[in-house]
């Protein structure tokens, strides 16, 4: 493609969403295959960005389907564990944007413990219909939600052993984990395991 065929990093004639918090990279088929519910989430900018006083962050992404990434941010009440406000940043296709926004709406008002029971199917239902070859995006959002849960407890001082006992602990044999090349919860678990092994070695 020639430089003169580009405008602001997107091909001329093809509308792309490009903001500080949302970066659309795929627009081959426009909105074909998306339900009205999913497109409404894409158009909803009220949940983009980082809320004030965030104390839990989760991230998941992969380059297996192009550069796909989602970051979720939450302000969690430390006493009640209720997620009072959440926001997101997304990089990828419209389905990824819709999945991220759906995750934020689904999280708000729930406790961290309730949110830890997230599944890709739950978020897919909340998101609405997307093209079949984009259905995996709900899995990235589910991983990012688990990352929010894990990050909250790590910031509260949870150890590797504490995290393993929780329902949102990493399951590296799960399909979600296999799909995600980058996962903030997995990274945190690795760091905690290293710290645990070092402590055990010193005490031996």
Question: Predicted regions span which residues?
Answer:
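C-terminal binding/interaction regions
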Residues: 2-48, 58-59, 77, 113, ...
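Active-site- and interface-proximal helix/loop "cap" or "latch" segments in soluble metabolic
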Residues: 62-66, 75-139
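Gly/Pro-rich active-site capping loops and adjacent beta-alpha segments
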Residues: 72
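Flexible, solvent-exposed loop/hinge segments and secondary-structure transition points
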Residues: 38, 53-55, 86-89
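Broad hydrophobic/π-residue packing in well-ordered secondary structure
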Residues: 33-35, 42, 66-68, 87-88
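Active-site cofactor/cluster-binding pocket
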Residues: 54-55, 61-69
């Amino acid at each position: 493609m020639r430089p003169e065929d580009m405008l602001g990093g997107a091909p001329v004639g093809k509308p792309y969403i490009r903001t500080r918090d949302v970066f659309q990279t795929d627009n081959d088929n426009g909105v074909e295959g998306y339900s009205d519910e999913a497109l409404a989430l894409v158009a909803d900018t009220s949940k983009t960005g980082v809320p004030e006083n965030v104390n839990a962050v989760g991230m998941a992404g992969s380059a297996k389907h192009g550069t796909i990434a989602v970051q979720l941010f939450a302000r969690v009440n430390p006493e009640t564990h209720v997620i009072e406000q959440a926001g997101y940043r997304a990089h990828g296709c419209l389905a990824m944007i819709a999945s991220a926004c759906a995750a934020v709406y689904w999280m708000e008002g729930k406790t961290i413990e309730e949110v830890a029971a997230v599944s890709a199917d739950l978020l897919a239902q909340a998101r609405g219909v997307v093209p079949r070859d984009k259905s995996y995006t709900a899995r990235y959002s589910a991983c990012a939600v688990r990352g929010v849960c894990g990050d909250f407890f790590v910031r509260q001082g949870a150890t590797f052993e504490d995290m393993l006992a929780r329902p949102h602990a990493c399951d590296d044999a799960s399909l979600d984990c296999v799909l995600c090349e980058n996962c903030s919860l997995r990274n945190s678990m690795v760091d905690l395991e290293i710290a645990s092994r070092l402590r055990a070695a010193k005490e031996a």
